[in-house]
């Protein structure tokens, strides 16, 4: 079911999806000892006017993966997936900001106490007016994004035929479990002259490699980007870009850069 509401500059919608009982694949095997349903809640709201906009999204997934062949559950390429579920995080533009990319977690895995995800995303845009101290002659555009995703808090029971217990789990409706991913970004776009403009970009990420990829630990990183474009006239321009990623993982410290010359024939 879905309900939408719009009034002037405000909008809001909520959606609820229910999945019927389905066999859960555990340890590479399907068994009728572990059969349960799933659900999804999605809520989105926002407000926009000239020079300002805000958008907030909340989502809760529980056992919402669905495949045309049940044995395909858990494959890393999402083959046979019927309802692909995207991760609700910012789509970054730069190379080093896309090393740790979050995937929506909708599967059940009792070994890692997983049954889905809960979290949200917030987008904020503001344009500082022209002819002000921070806006300057052409104005300044600022964009903020924050997202946070965690597991579902609850109790997870392993299959134990000797003890007479069936595999199962019971989770809280709005309970937050272990952290899966977080992303905070700040983008500043500034036009200096009719021919010269720049972008300053900062991102802080936490990425639970064990949950998203199946092995590893939490990786926290900070990424900074500077980009500047200068128009040379006659359809020609030169663009410079410098990127730096620092993390608490010895294998994930990177530096990158680009110099690009564009011509329009």
Q: What annotation goes with each model-predicted range?
A:
Residues 1-265:
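Exposed, low-structure sequence patches enriched in small/polar residues
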């Amino acid at each position: 079911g879905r309900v939408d509401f719009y009034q002037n500059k405000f909008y809001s919608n909520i959606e609820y999806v229910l999945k019927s009982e389905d066999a859960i694949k555990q340890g590479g095997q399907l068994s009728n000892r572990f059969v349960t349903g799933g659900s999804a809640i999605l809520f989105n709201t926002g407000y926009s006017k000239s020079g300002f906009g805000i958008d907030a999204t909340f989502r809760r997934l529980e056992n919402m993966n669905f495949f045309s062949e049940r044995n395909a559950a858990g494959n890393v390429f999402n083959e046979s997936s019927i309802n692909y579920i995207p991760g609700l995080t910012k789509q970054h533009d730069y190379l080093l900001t896309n090393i740790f990319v979050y995937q929506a977690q909708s599967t059940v895995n009792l070994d890692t106490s997983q049954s889905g995800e809960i979290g949200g995303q917030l987008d904020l845009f503001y344009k500082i007016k022209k002819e002000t101290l921070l806006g300057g002659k052409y104005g300044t555009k600022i964009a903020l994004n924050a997202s946070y995703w965690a597991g579902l808090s609850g109790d997870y029971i392993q299959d134990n035929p000797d003890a007479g217990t069936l595999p199962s789990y019971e989770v809280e409706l709005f309970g937050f479990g272990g952290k899966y991913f977080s992303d905070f970004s700040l983008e500043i776009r500034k036009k200096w002259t009719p021919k010269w403009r720049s972008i300053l970009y900062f991102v802080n990420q936490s990425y639970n490699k064990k949950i998203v990829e199946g092995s590893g630990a939490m990786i926290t990183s900070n990424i900074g980007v500077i980009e500047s474009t200068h128009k040379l006239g006659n359809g020609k321009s030169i663009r410079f870009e410098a990127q730096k990623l620092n993390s608490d993982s010895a294998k994930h410290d990177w530096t990158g850069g680009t110099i690009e010359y564009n011509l329009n024939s």
